[in-house]
From Swiss-Prot:
Coiled coil: none annotated. The keyword Membrane does not apply. It comes from Bos taurus. Its EC number is 3.4.19.12. The modification Phosphoserine is found at residue 125. It is found in: Nucleus. Belongs to the MINDY deubiquitinase family. FAM188 subfamily. It catalyses: Thiol-dependent hydrolysis of ester, thioester, amide, peptide and isopeptide bonds formed by the C-terminal Gly of ubiquitin (a 76-residue protein attached to proteins as an intracellular targeting signal). The lineage of its organism: Eukaryota, Metazoa, Chordata, Craniata, Vertebrata. The active site is at residues 51, 287. This is Ubiquitin carboxyl-terminal hydrolase MINDY-3.
Length: 445
């Protein structure tokens, strides 16, 4: 087994997990990208864990299906179209991961039937025809096991996107086999570069896959969503006790919302909360699903008041709803507002008449951005995807359709429900109400 293989295993699985535990978690991750029989473009997830890869792939697949295709019946997805969609999606994610790595791309595959001595492992062998490598799901996981599988994988490198796209398409059967999800994950990690990932992760000793529960880390989710394996979901970088904590640096194509924000464990920044396309990964405590819509008006450019709210909140990392008055000048400069000292003092007195030394978000927005509501439609059709059969209505992996209504602060609330999915979506739309076409609300778990 090569040093690169060992580094990869430590990055993903950690160094101290027992072999038995590794095999248990490993088996939960050994599945391919398999489409649902009930919904042509929906990927199925067999056990808990691999949603950290499957959900982002599903989200980017939907982006391509909904916004790069002219077809009207988007839910009608024949096999040849699925093949093309999946391969293009995998390439897009690999391209995003490779942006910091001088345009070099990697694919990891496994060599069935080879001995450890015969296998180059991750020695970086040059690109070769796929006929030299067998991609079959016939060999059971139990026959391989954790150690054996990692002794039978190899890396191939590509210098151009065109070569990569041809290889990904050529190896379509590999992505659907029993190891497809892991092989794609390893391809992303090696395309990004192990050292690059370690430089972005807050604690490089923490594995990307939890060795006890098998869940993917936030760094892994962020890597697949943005191409950067940072550990946080806020906008930009922050300093804490002299330590630099990396966040998200630009608007993501696909967004991220989490129930953890509704529970006040974290605060997702605008770059993930307001993505380029109306598709969001939705996180519960243990699982990832996808919430999406076809209405691009949902991701219209920020209104000035929304930009002001975002900038104000970067100076309020604790989400208190206020900042010290000493920071008012910084906020106003960041928003290109008048910021000469006399005017700043005038505004401090107006916004803090009691002299408490704080500036509240509400009065600040009302002063500089009055009568500016949130942009976007008030009512829109939405869909929810959950890859686990047992979590779906009638145990069929299908998109659940619904109608979302976004109300103003002063509107009487319809109060349709108080479900986890609604609480999660309220972190993006505080006054959202949801009406689903099924008898029960979609599950986040």
């Amino acid at each position: 087994m090569s040093e690169l293989t060992k580094e990869l295993m430590e990055l993903v699985w950690g160094t101290n997990s027992s072999p038995g535990l590794s095999d248990t978690i490993f088996c939960r991750w050994t599945q391919g990208f398999v489409f649902s029989e009930s919904e042509g473009s929906a990927l199925e997830q067999f056990e808990g864990g691999p949603c950290a890869v499957i959900a982002p792939v599903q989200a980017f697949l939907l982006k391509k299906l909904l916004f790069s295709s002219e077809k009207s019946s988007w839910r009608d997805c024949p096999e040849e179209e699925r093949k093309e969609l999946l391969c293009h999606t995998l390439c897009d994610i690999l391209e995003s991961a490779g942006c910091d790595n001088s345009g070099s791309y990697c694919l990891v595959s496994w060599l069935r039937g080879k001995t450890t001595e015969e296998t180059a492992s991750l020695s970086g062998s040059p690109a070769q025809s796929s006929c030299q490598v067998e991609h079959s799901s016939a060999l059971a996981v139990e026959e391989l096991g954790f150690e054996r599988f990692h002794a039978l994988i190899q890396k191939r490198s590509f210098r151009s996107l065109a070569e990569l796209r041809d290889a990904v398409l050529d190896q379509y059967s590999m992505w659907g086999n029993k190891f497809g999800v892991l092989l794609f994950l390893y391809s992303v990690l090696l395309t990004k570069g192990i050292e690059n990932i370690k430089n972005e992760i807050e604690d490089s000793s923490e594995p990307l896959i939890d060795p006890v529960y098998g869940h993917g880390s936030q760094s892994l989710i962020n890597l697949l969503l943005t191409g950067h394996a940072v550990s946080n979901v806020w906008d930009g970088d922050r300093e804490c006790s002299g330590m630099k904590l990396l966040g998200i640096h630009e608007q993501a194509a696909v967004g991220f919302l989490t129930l953890m924000e509704a529970l006040r464990y974290c605060k997702v920044g605008s770059y993930l909360k307001s993505p380029k396309f109306p598709i969001w990964i939705v996180g519960s405590e243990t699982h990832l699903t996808v919430f999406f819509a076809k209405d691009m008006a949902l991701v219209a450019p920020e209104a000035p008041s929304e930009q002001a709210r975002r900038v104000f909140q970067t100076y309020d990392p604790e989400d208190n709803g206020f900042i010290p008055d000493s920071l008012l000048e910084d906020v106003m400069k960041a928003l290109d507002l008048v910021s000469d000292p006399e005017y700043i003092n005038l505004m401090k007195n107006k916004l803090d008449p009691e002299g408490l030394g704080i500036i509240l978000l509400g009065p600040f927005l009302q002063e500089f951005f009055p009568d500016q509501g949130s942009s976007g439609p008030e009512s829109f059709t939405v869909y929810h995807y959950n890859g686990l059969k047992q979590s779906n209505y009638n145990e069929k992996v299908m998109y659940v359709e619904g109608t979302a209504v976004v109300m103003g602060f002063e509107d009487p609330l319809l109060q349709t429900d108080d479900t986890p999915i609604k609480r999660c979506l309220q972190t993006k739309w505080p006054y959202i109400e949801l009406l689903w076409t099924t008898d029960r609300s979609p599950s986040l778990n």
